[in-house]
Swiss-Prot record:
The protein, known as: Protein transport protein sec24
Compositionally biased tracts (Low complexity): 1-38
Residues binding Zn(2+): 244, 247, 266, 269
Keyword Phosphoprotein: no
Oligomer and partners: The COPII coat is composed of at least 5 proteins: the sec23/24 complex, the sec13/31 complex, and the protein sar1. Golgi apparatus membrane; Peripheral membrane protein; Cytoplasmic side.
Reported function: Component of the coat protein complex II (COPII) which promotes the formation of transport vesicles from the endoplasmic reticulum (ER). The coat has two main functions, the physical deformation of the endoplasmic reticulum membrane into vesicles and the selection of cargo molecules.
Residue numbers spanned by region Disordered: 1-43
UniProt GO BP: COPII-coated vesicle cargo loading; intracellular protein transport
């Protein structure tokens, strides 16, 4: 990650050492990388044009120009100027060298700067490795405690404007009393990439939680990668699983041992349990084991290999049933050919370690076409096609041969996939009986369970679940638009529940250039633990479209999903799981059922406080019981410990703004689908006002000092994130957004893992024409490509001669300013003249110069979800946008600038003003 741009409030902010989140300060005179006027500037660089003005440094001078009165809140120092592609000086030689103007670092108290450097040198950025907190005076109301919690650091949102770097800071640290865990392991508490709490200090009473107006919820992402090898967690292989007899919690690093280690006290419900006899025995070496080395007592994230009693039936094999649309639309846009080729080329990537993986294929137009594929080595290797035209009661012609074992039929599956396209190349059918195909597929795989993968370019228009073209341009942007986001046919909800009960999950890959009713179709993935992938206007004739889908679909097939899974969250007595959000079926009050457990989604669980909590620490434990794709039954357990408090200031000082925003994103989607878009937007604005008012009344003494807007440092990004949500494609008020695009966006807002959701709500923007010397090159320590510092999403940050990358994780825009110098165009695109530059979807050319390599490295690194600690199959399209080019494309890119006014919505300045008035 690129270092943030400078001093967060000089870190007394959270009551932690200065090293927390703040980069090492530069000596006051020079900004990093800015040689003094006379100095040689290190490595020789090509300079495209000098800067015509000398206010600030580079295009991003606005980031740190004027210090607030008093200068106490460290403003972000200006970007070090890379004398890069600057504004051409008319009449001057555009190749002359001009040294960069030195930037000035923010004033910081010497002690803070010193500490910052010490901690910076120690590499203390991981919140788990932070030294003990500086002691704050204990509030009177609170019983004396061993460790003070995070301190509240008030800031003014109006005089100290939001800086995008604040969104990259880690959440406020979880401060536990010494000796909370049974062994002093650095891995005892759950890392934020798996579970984040909206509150890292939990109110002891429901009334205090209510008073705070903050939500108490967990954001849970049990897997941080598509494959175990990319994110291994400790496995307990001995099948000795110790659980509390009463509340069924799993033994974890926060239990207490009693009676010379023969018994353990549950940290959730306080019951004393016996330690199993084999707990201290090493089955592999057949000798006594050291208990203090057991993974389940040292690691908050572990996986247990489950014994027989955790299985209702033998572990199910991995089953993929492909339902492929072969109607005219799907053949002409190249979907059928691309899908067949992609499956064929990905057969080796489909998990099959136990050699039990099974595949099946049903082609769909006005009839259902089943395929019987013989075993390799049979006399006849030809696949047989069986056509069923009865769509109301589809039956299975020969149930035995329609699902085949990949290992036994590998060669004949390849022969079949090679021929699939030819079979339908002359089709004229516009009908698509996908609902009937889903019913038939369910019949075929429900005895074993598995995944139905739907690939379709058409609206299901005959048979079960048939849908009609109901989008009406006249209702877009009005209150009636919300009805288009509801399901048009009850089949999609009732059938999804049936699927869930039979361990059948559905994924939708949708490719239509016309209305496809994503709102209805997305219900199937929503209730079966699947996902909806939407490719509007896709056509294989465009290389970029074909490559994007092929890469994503291949990664999708290779992903190590869990099967027949259930998720449950248990917690300390007094806490109760109240509401669950995400793609699954809520089978009972606290059990979420997943026929397949994906690796690229997150879930939100709201926690209620039913009775006063008397303990100094509460624990919340998530358990996912599942079958791996290799046929092994396992339980992944994630245990999070949080301190408690009776003090509202502690609650606010420890709130995690990104987790809070994730919770409200899920709430807003639920509200949009149940009540409509306007109520969802209003609820977000009301909540922002409520939080600001509560903070002012309860913690800022109710004063309206100088007309400011007070809010704690750790929550400064929240009002901006709320505005960005209201302006997101899924929720914003507009008469220009096709319903399918909106429905697909709502799917993302309610499933994306937290880092990707934050980027989808508030995209990243990087200035490339003047990026620092190190950007786009590997970091010397880690080897990871360094990104330039992100800049705020405001057109004020964009200069007319600049080159910018804007990336929301789903789509990337490369913005070329209208006055970009010819040298920049030549270096990046290999073209003599900007007029030759075509706009739209494309890949950047490989031009033989260092700057082109660095720009391409930044574009690629910005797509790298692994470095964000998440699994994802998405490969964003890159669109080249000229500021003076195609207006539709330019307007689309500008909707990403969420701090600007646009299309019926307010700017950030107006939004802050309206919040200030209402508070």
């Amino acid at each position: 990650m690129a270092a943030p741009q400078g001093g967060y409030p000089p870190q007394e902010g959270y009551g932690q050492p200065a090293g927390y989140g703040s980069p090492v300060q530069q000596p006051a005179g020079l900004a990093a990388g800015a040689p003094a006027q006379g100095q040689a500037g290190g490595r020789k660089k090509r300079v495209y044009a000098g800067e015509a003005f000398d206010f600030g440094s580079g295009a991003n001078a606005a980031l740190g120009g004027q210090l607030p009165a008093g200068g106490s809140y460290g403003a972000y120092p200006p970007q070090p100027q890379a004398a890069g592609y600057q504004q051409p000086m008319y009449g001057a030689d555009p190749t002359q060298v001009q040294a960069a103007a030195p930037g000035y670092a923010a004033p910081v108290s010497p002690q803070v700067a010193q500490m910052t450097q010490q901690f910076g040198a120690m590499g203390m950025t991981d919140p788990h490795l932070l030294p003990p907190q500086p002691v704050a005076p204990a509030p009177q109301a609170q019983a004396p405690r061993a460790v003070p919690l995070n301190q509240l650091y008030p800031t003014d949102l109006l005089t100290q404007p939001f800086n995008v770097a604040e969104l990259d800071y880690p959440p406020p640290p979880i401060v536990l009393p010494p000796g909370t865990s049974v062994y002093p392991s650095p891995y005892a508490n759950c890392p934020p990439k798996y579970v984040r709490s909206t509150l890292n200090a939990v109110p002891t009473t429901s009334s205090l939680l209510k008073k705070s107006k903050l939500p108490f919820a967990l954001v849970i992402q049990p897997y941080a990668a598509l494959h175990d090898s990319e994110d291994p967690v400790p496995v307990v292989p001995d099948q000795v699983i110790s659980r509390c007899r009463r509340c069924r919690s799993y033994i974890n690093p926060f239990v207490t041992f009693l009676d010379h280690g023969h018994r353990w006290r549950c940290n959730m419900c306080n019951l004393t349990n016996d330690v199993p006899q084999a707990f201290d025995w090493d089955t592999a070496l057949q000798k006594p084991a050291d208990r203090s080395l057991r993974p389940d007592l040292n690691h908050s994230v572990v996986e247990f290999v489950a014994p027989q009693e955790y299985m209702v039936r033998p572990p199910q094999p991995l089953v993929y049933l492909f339902l492929i649309d072969v109607s005219y639309a799907s053949v002409t846009n190249g979907l059928l050919a691309t899908t067949a080729r992609c499956i064929r080329e990905s057969l080796d990537r489909i998990p099959n370690a136990d050699r039990r993986t099974r595949l099946g294929f049903i082609a769909v137009d006005s009839s259902l076409h089943y395929f019987s594929i013989p075993r390799d080595g049979s006399e006849n290797s030809e696949p047989r096609m069986l056509v069923i035209s009865d769509l109301d009661e589809p039956f299975l012609p020969i149930p035995g041969d329609l699902l085949v074992t990949l290992s036994e039929c590998r060669e004949n599956i390849e022969i079949f996939l090679d021929k699939l396209q030819e079979m339908f190349q002359n089709t004229q059918s516009n009908a698509c009986a996908m609902g009937s195909a889903l019913r038939a597929g369910y019949k075929l795989i429900s005895p074993v369970g598995g995944k139905m993968t739907v690939l379709s370019s058409s609206l299901p228009n005959i048979g079960h679940g048939s849908l009609t073209m109901r989008e009406d341009k006249k209702v877009l942007g009005t209150s009636k638009e919300s009805s288009l986001l509801q399901t048009a046919n009850s089949f999609y909800k009732s059938f999804a529940v049936e699927c869930s009960k039979a361990q059948v999950s559905v994924d939708m890959f949708l490719f239509s250039s016309q209305y496809q009713d994503v709102a209805s179709l997305s219900n199937l993935p929503r209730y079966t633990g699947g996902q909806t992938y939407f490719y509007p206007g896709w056509n294989a004739a465009r290389g970029e479209d074909a490559i994007k889908f092929a890469r994503e679909f291949s990664d999708y097939l290779s992903s190590e999903i869990g099967l027949e899974a259930v998720l449950r969250v248990r917690a300390t007595t007094g806490l109760r799981m109240n509401t669950f959000y995400g793609n699954f079926f809520n089978r009972s009050s606290d059990l979420c059922a997943f026929p397949a457990f994906p690796r690229d989604q997150a879930y939100v669980v709201e926690v209620a406080i039913d009775e006063t909590v008397t303990k100094p620490v509460v624990c919340l434990q998530t358990a996912v019981l599942h079958t791996t794709c290799n046929g092994e039954r396992r339980i992944r357990v994630l245990t999070l410990a949080l301190p408690t408090t009776q003090n509202l200031a502690d609650v606010y000082a420890s709130a995690d703004q990104q987790a809070v925003a994730t919770y409200f994103s899920h709430k807003a989607v639920e509200r949009a689908l149940s009540s409509g878009l306007e109520p969802a937007r209003e609820a977000l604005q009301t909540k922002a006002v409520e939080l600001l008012s509560t903070y002012r009344k309860e913690l800022a003494g109710g004063s309206v000092s100088g007309g400011g807007l007070q809010f704690p440092a750790n929550l400064r990004g929240l009002p901006v994130l709320f505005l960005a949500m209201i302006k997101n494609l899924g929720l914003r008020k507009s008469a220009q957004i096709p319903t399918d695009m909106r429905s697909a966006a709502l799917c993302l807002l309610s499933t994306l893992p937290l880092p990707l959701l934050m980027q989808y709500i508030y995209p990243k923007m990087y200035s490339l024409h003047d990026m620092p010397d190190t950007a786009g090159l590997p970091d010397e320590q880690t080897g990871e490509i360094l990104l330039p510092p992100p800049i705020n999403l405001s057109s004020e940050r964009i200069v007319p001669y600049g080159l910018y990358l804007i990336d929301d994780g789903q789509t990337q825009f490369l913005w070329v300013g209208r006055d970009a110098v010819p040298q920049l165009i030549e270096d990046v695109f290999g073209l003599q003249d900007k007029s030759q530059l075509r706009v739209g979807k494309q890949n950047l050319p490989d031009v033989d110069n260092e700057f082109n390599q660095r720009v391409r490295a930044v574009v690629e690194k910005s797509r790298d979800h692994r470095s964000k600690g998440v699994g994802s199959i998405v490969v964003p399209h890159l669109y080249v946008v000229k500021e003076d080019g195609e207006p539709g494309l330019r307007l689309w890119a500008q909707t990403m600038l969420v701090e600007d006014r646009a299309d019926q919505s307010v700017s950030l300045v107006q939004w802050m003003g309206s919040l200030r008035e209402k508070v």
